Amino acid sequence: MRLPTYVPRLLLILCFTAAQVLPAAEVDTETEAPETAAAADVVDDADNEEEEDKGPTFAETVKGFRHLPGLFDLYIDDEENKVFLALTPEQFGEVFLCNISRTQGDGFFFDAGATIGLGLSGYGMPIRFDRVGKTIFFKHPNVYYQAEPDAAIRRAVERLSDSVLGMATIEGQPHPETGAVLLDPSPLFVQDIAMIGFVFSKMDDVSYSIDAGMSYFGELTNHPTNTEVDVVLTFTTSSPKIEIPTLPDSRSFQHIYHYSLSQLPDSDFRPRMADDRVGHFLTLHQDYTSVLDHDAYVRYVNRWHLEKAEPRFKVSKPKEPIVYWLENTIPVEYRDAVREGVLLWNDAFERIGFEDAIVVKQQPDAADWDAADARYSTIRWMVQPGRGYAVGPSRTNPFTGEIYDADIRISADFIRYAYREFTELANPVARRQQAIGDSIASTLGLLGDPMHTCSMADGLMQEAAFGWHVLNARAGDGGMADPDVQSYLRQLIIELVAHEVGHTLGLRHNFKASTIHTLAELHDPETNQREGVAGSVMDYNPVNIAPDGHPQGEYYMTHLGTYDYWAIEYAYKPLDEDGDSERKQLARIASRAAEPDLTYATDEDAFYDTRGIDPHATRWDLRDDAIAHYRDLISISDELWSKMEDKFQKKGERYQTLRRVFGWGFRPYTSGTGNVARYVGGIFHHRDHIGDPDGRQPFVPVPAQRQREALAFITEHVLGPDAFQWSPELLNKLAPERWQDFTWSQYVGVTRIETPIHQLVLNVQRQPLNRFYDPMLLQRLLDLELRFPADEEPFTMAELFATLRSSIWAEAIQGAPINSFRRNLQREHLHHLETLVLRLPA
């Protein structure tokens, strides 16, 4: 049974409802005086006990403690690792912002530098301290349902529960002058705030939980507008079921979480209404002021507060630029490329009137501030061995959508990814780590916002490895020349950084942007310089490798695409105060959605499974003709395989290199087979509004002839009898890695050390078959017969079945010999037919 969509969110908010505490009734001493002397004595005794219960004075409580003034004053006993936090009466009931980052990870399950988001808050969580007697409640206030102050329904909205994150008891007496009270903040901060224990509970063979007795406060710093708190959390298990290669002892590890508590931004920032035709991250709430509105949601674009210093000029510097700091962990040799990737976005801002909207600064080696400090937006290098990825979250004001902090983290291993084996050929432990990573990501998807998920870097590194080996196969005996290597890596880093910076500027993915250029345009230097390789850096763009003998353009996006300029214009263009209303001006910008170069689709349009209906809304595709593009890529794979013995089999080198190169030749198959299969039963989906210039209908079936072309491509290049052919000599040279490593991969989980070639091919062939025989796709094919124009013969389910049957069983029909790959394929085909007949859901 499918859970309602709201259930995961309800589970993650930690919704403990605070009991309503009613004030005690006031006693009228004249009318309700004690009736007896004994009763009077009881009252006197109670008064005396109350005086004694006040405890030590404020000064006595913090005697010997180091005072650290700031937003929330801290008192610290370094020897005892004891901390008091002071709250003034004015701070009770006020909403603050709490940003949480993991600044130290274990390197296997979780990395360092991660931004932690909780529930509906995303990455900028509102918090509030409420006092009830001598108890302080640490709350996540419910700001997601609102109404105007003078609306009667406001009272009902305010009765919706907040979430309680922790509680603490007041220590000693208030400060005699400020009225501030002291509390031990350990129960508030020294807790499993990231719900690591919950994540592990959903995984097999992993059983770590927090040990509060071994957890403690780390570094504490304070500033007038923000308080920074580090907590060291220890996770332990008495029975580790797997060896963690990044730990000296798998029975325990420590994470450091950094809390950055700050005031809400105080500015004249104006929220900007979002539009579904352009892809931005959103801050949203439901407004109950009027029940007549057709949609209760109010959606704001997430964006930085950017204003012209000189509004009268067409182009002006901003009052306050967006500043990114390059953390001192970034290798020196990559810093220029990282800087270039950040500053790429200034081109888009200049078109709408901002000069140098973005500024890049270098963190000094001796800097005394931490990148987790909410005052600094950073780009950081972090270590998680064997993983190649990058993410770019930002933090926003939950009331307005104003972005006030962003921290991009990039895996140090992503450059080395080209030297790894392809995923299907990786050692069992490496595959297991990938599976664990996928399980963690899936579980965290229940806790956070799936729209903020980004796996671009992992796939980009696979693309980079494929391109790297192809270019080395085409080069002379010495491989790529050093300048070519540096140019390749520079372009790669620029695109990766520009993509993640785009996220921190508020832009979502655009998985249609890669479809706007022809083959000639992809490799035309002028087009590359003017419009980039694709329509947006926010797509998952593959490496742009030209077919053998064809002129070569840029390998990666080193310039913004046409969509990027449009998305920045919508979010940041200063609006004319004297012109049309804001809504009309924004609608005019968004109404360009039907222009071919502005085509847009995002994560919810690009599901990998059969929920994804649009063959243009895919990852790792390129060119206006995807089928032709993948046909070229398969020819490039054949080229790589044919040249690999000559180019990579060098005297004195190890045979493991050949196995690695052989594996990367499968990359076009793993990325392309599923994408081409989407044309079969596909529907182009558009977000145009009624009345847009050249507007399109929401759904347009893929032409039947195009579906037949896609199926023909699959049957020839993936399912056909001549699809996969290698010499025995080559297969016998594909040696596995025999060096010892931290994972004992040459022992643990090893079943076969030779290359499982039939399994590799079958894995590729299963991709289209799994899609073609999925009940949802078959139902869609049936429905599509009603969607085609009367003058077009539709592509039908019967045609799909007949084409696959005649292709897969051609030898049996003709009485010809059947090779081993085809026998495997025929067994797989029978399995799908059996499933349809015997176990098809009602």
Map each language-model feature to its residues:
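Sec/Tat signal peptide C-region and signal peptidase I cleavage site
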Residues: 21-24
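Sec-exported extracytoplasmic/periplasmic mature domains
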Residues: 343-354, 384, 502-503, 507, ...
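Short pre-active-site segment immediately N-terminal to the catalytic Zn-binding motif
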Residues: 330-334, 479-497
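Bacterial N-terminal signal peptides that target proteins for export
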Residues: 1-11
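Bacterial N-terminal signal peptides
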Residues: 9-19
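Auxiliary tRNA-acceptor-end handling modules of aminoacyl-tRNA synthetases
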Residues: 27-330, 348, 352, 357, ...
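The catalytic-center signature of Zn2+-dependent metalloproteases
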Residues: 362-383, 491-547
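Conserved catalytic/binding loops enriched for acidic/polar residues
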Residues: 476, 483-488, 513-842
